[in-house]
Amino acid sequence: MMSETIITTPHVVKLISNFFQKKLFSSISTAYPLVIITDVSVQQHLLGPILDHIKMLGYQVIVLTFPPGEPNKTWETFISLQYQLVDQNISPKSSIIGIGGGTVLDMTGFLAATYCRGLPLYLIPTTITAMVDTSIGGKNGINLRGIKNRLGTFYLPKEVWMCPQFLSTLPREEWYHGIAEAIKHGFIADAYLWEFLNSHSKMLFSSSQILHEFIKRNCQIKAAIVAEDPYDRSLRKILNFGHSIAHAIETLAKGTVNHGQAVSVGMMIETRISLAEGVMKTPQLIDQLERLLKRFNLPSTLKDLQSIVPEHLHNSLYSPENIIYTLGYDKKNLSQHELKMIMIEHLGRAAPFNGTYCASPNMEILYDILWSECHVMRHC
């Protein structure tokens, strides 16, 4: 496989064996500087050969970097990068390429959408999370005053180029974090993917064929949802399953919990809410979800995050009141006092709720489930 186009709508996604293909860059003009956005970790470990190849093709390349990690996906980083684009006098006809994980792609997408009202955008994801989730669908965001993705836009890339070889540089834990989003895709929309993950959990790390099928299936699931609802008004909301709780965890834990870990716990809690609300009728699905998460060394309870979150943040995180207050900032809400949440109907199907795909949880049920999670922690 040199290059396989696995998605054409809402934007092109190509699965490639390497980047040393001249035709890959054929749609990008050499008449204007090519801007690359990445973090310092990717710059040190992956960027060199790609940069040499791009320069060999005749491009003038400007590389802008920022420190890695979610805590740096901030307004301050965004403005600093915008200033650098202005200082370099980057033309509106220049293309911008984001190379990295979810944080880099979020930041690059927001930069591309806002600089000169839009630069041609290309994305090169280097992590599982970025390949199966962040790079698909054109949604981007940065954090503001510690609130997850408070600022953002919908801005589609021209193309996304995925090279699974990049994943060989990742520690196994990074793979696991990305697989949380894949488990979500199976849970809300595709029972086949769910069974695929159950059947191929070990081969995923050793078989390139299985890995390619895994990436392809996830991209196609998300792309189909986005194509039907590009602006997050109805069906696309189901992609937020597990994320209401997850974003509250990430906010209260001050970025010390990885997004995949937070989504993993968020899915478990929101599944319990779905059952308690009577939306889901199969209690065994909770155990099935937990077993699959554990197979990939993912947490399933707030208690599982105890060793990750610094002790001085425990009182903040392990408080039902704090979690509910932080849920008030979730973008699905109609107001801070009218929470909205995605719920599961059965395996492979999120509850439609008459086409809104989200509903207000019973606050007593929500509090009781959060209290049971936090109460265990307070008595450890």
Curated annotation (Swiss-Prot):
This is 3-dehydroquinate synthase. InterPro entries: Dehydroquinate_synthase (IPR050071), DHQ_synth_AroB (IPR016037), DHQ_synth_fam (IPR030963), DHQS/DOIS_N (IPR030960), DHQS_C (IPR056179). Its EC number is 4.2.3.4. It catalyses: 7-phospho-2-dehydro-3-deoxy-D-arabino-heptonate = 3-dehydroquinate + phosphate. Binds 1 divalent metal cation per subunit. Can use either Co(2+) or Zn(2+). Its cofactor is NAD(+); Co(2+); Zn(2+). NAD(+) binds at residues 68-73, 102-106, 126-127, 139, 148. PANTHER family: 3-DEHYDROQUINATE SYNTHASE, 3-DEHYDROQUINATE SYNTHASE, CHLOROPLASTIC. Its main location: cytoplasm. Catalyzes the conversion of 3-deoxy-D-arabino-heptulosonate 7-phosphate (DAHP) to dehydroquinate (DHQ). One of its GO terms (molecular function) is nucleotide binding. Belongs to the sugar phosphate cyclases superfamily. Dehydroquinate synthase family. The keyword Membrane does not apply. The gene is aroB. Pfam families: DHQ_synthase, DHQS_C.
